[in-house]
Amino acid sequence: MIMKTYFSGVSTLGVHSLATEDYGFFPLSVDQKTMERMKNVLDIPATQLNISNSSLIGSLCVGNSNGLLVPNITTEKELELIKMFLKENSLDVNLERLKAKNTAFGNLILTNNKGCIISEELSRFRKTIEDVLDVESGVGNYAELPTVGSNGVATDKGCLVHPLTDELELEWIQDILRVDYVERGTANRGVTSVGACILANTKGAVVGGDTSGPEILKIEEALDLID
C-alpha cells in the first residue's frame, strides 16, 4: 500500500520523519488523522517528537529494527522520550547518541535490517554504526554524492536510488543491502533525493504529495510493494 501526503504543505517527508520495519518517528506538526493513516500504511507504532529541538528527524537520525543512531545534539528530554516509546512498545532497539562532527546521520547512512551503506564522511565511525544497527556495512558514495542516505530509500526487499547511480554502483548497493531489487528513480515530480521524499518498509510506503503516478509505479517496483 502506498499513501501520498504532505507535512504542513511540505512534500519532503523523509527529511522530517523516520520509518523502519518496526517503529516510526514523525514531527510534531503532523495532524492526528495523517499520523494514524501513516501508522496503518506502514503497520508500525509511531510517536511524534523533535531531535535537537528540530523537526529534521529523518536528516539527523538513522535506524533499523536493531538500532537507532541519534546525533550528539539530541537533548536529554528527547532521548528519554525515545527510550519511553521503545519501552512502551516492547522494542529491543540499541540507542546510541553518536559524537560525530557531521550530525546528519539520516543523510549519510542508508540501511535496512540486512546491511548499511555509510558515507565516506562517517567512515571513522564504521564499527560503532555496524554494532548499533547490527549489520555489516560498505563505505562509499554513489551517483558521485556523499549523501547516500537522502539519495536512497531501502527496505528488506528492495531499494530505490538516485537516477545517476551507475550499474556497478547498483550491484554494489544490492550486494551490501542484500535485496532483490535496486532501481533508479525520482519522487515529488523529479526530485532525485528519493530518501528525502519517501518513508517505506516491506509493508507499505508513504510518499510526498507531489509524487506522480509513474514515480509511484517505479517505487512500488523497486520496493516490491506490488500486490
UniProtKB/Swiss-Prot annotation:
Family of this protein: Belongs to the eIF-6 family.
HAMAP family given in the database record: eIF_6
Native source organism of the sequence: Methanococcus maripaludis (strain DSM 14266 / JCM 13030 / NBRC 101832 / S2 / LL)
Keyword Amino-acid biosynthesis: no
GO molecular function, one term: translation initiation factor activity
Gene designation per UniProt: eif6
Pfam families assigned: eIF-6 (PF01912)
Descriptive protein name: Translation initiation factor 6
SUPFAM superfamilies in the record: Pentein
